[in-house]
Amino acid sequence: MSVTQQTLEQLAAALRGAEANGTAIEPLRGAIGEDNGTAAYAIQRLNVAHAVAAGRRVVGRKIGLTNPKVQRQLGVDQPDFGTLFADMSHGDNEVLSIKRVLQPKIEAEIALILERDLPRADTTFAELAEATGWVLPALEIVGSRVRDWNIRFVDTVADNASSGCFVLGGPVRRLAGVDLRRAAMRMTRNGEEVSSGSGAECLGHPLNAAVWLARTMAGLGEPLKAGDLILTGALGPMVGVAAGDRFEAEIEGIGQVGVEFGAA
């Protein structure tokens, strides 16, 4: 399905408007086609460029749709990526407004910080591991500018992979000696378990997800760099969020992270 530049720009503006106004819009797939990933990423790039021009600072990338349970929840069958900005980052145990993210949901993830550039489109698992400086637990608060989370692959891609904000926990660890694949995750809401999983549910290994991202970004001419933060994807099902909720996640061998949601 051919999509004009004018249409791409109109859809990008509609997503920005939804974010600014707090009012979700209809799915984009009707305008660009259900399988038009090229157009979806073009919309995402337009909004990233708009954000950078407005002074927002890129600090890394997120990988979405890596967990089979999340894929089933959203009716998709492949990963995607989005851009992380500095103003999306929050500290461990912060209290966030429930209106911080539109239609918020939460998931626990393993975050990586690179200490070397990854310029090659054929980056290997070993090269990715060598380039990873630090590992830490994270909570990603995802959101959707699309009404009722009625999304397919192209909808979430265009919407910056349904990015909202994220919380980084601790301690910060070196990768050596940490078994990311076997790392078990348990997330609670107000003390009751609501999500669980392990690193193996993230494309078989969180570093597999990071390799996919490194290859993809290098192929696009935007390779990952030293200092970049990578959110590697959900370790278990995402969970809805309401005002007053407190979430805590523990990832075995890595650490803990928490966040609380207050009123508007």
Curated annotation (Swiss-Prot):
It catalyses: (S)-4-hydroxy-2-oxopentanoate = (2Z)-2-hydroxypenta-2,4-dienoate + H2O. Keywords: Aromatic hydrocarbons catabolism, Lyase. GO terms for biological process: 3-phenylpropionate catabolic process. Its EC number is 4.2.1.80. It is an enzyme of class 4 (lyase). The keyword Transmembrane helix does not apply. Pfam families: FAA_hydrolase. GO terms for cellular component: cytoplasm. GO terms for molecular function: 2-oxopent-4-enoate hydratase activity; manganese ion binding. Pathway: Aromatic compound metabolism; 3-phenylpropanoate degradation. SUPFAM superfamilies: FAH. InterPro entries: Fumarylacetoacetase-like_C, Fumarylacetoacetase_C_sf, Hydratase-Decarb/MhpD_sf, Keto_pentenoate-hydratase. Its cofactor is a divalent metal cation. Belongs to the hydratase/decarboxylase family. MhpD subfamily. Catalyzes the conversion of 2-hydroxypentadienoic acid (enolic form of 2-oxopent-4-enoate) to 4-hydroxy-2-ketopentanoic acid. NCBIfam families: PRK11342.1 (NF008461). This is 2-keto-4-pentenoate hydratase.
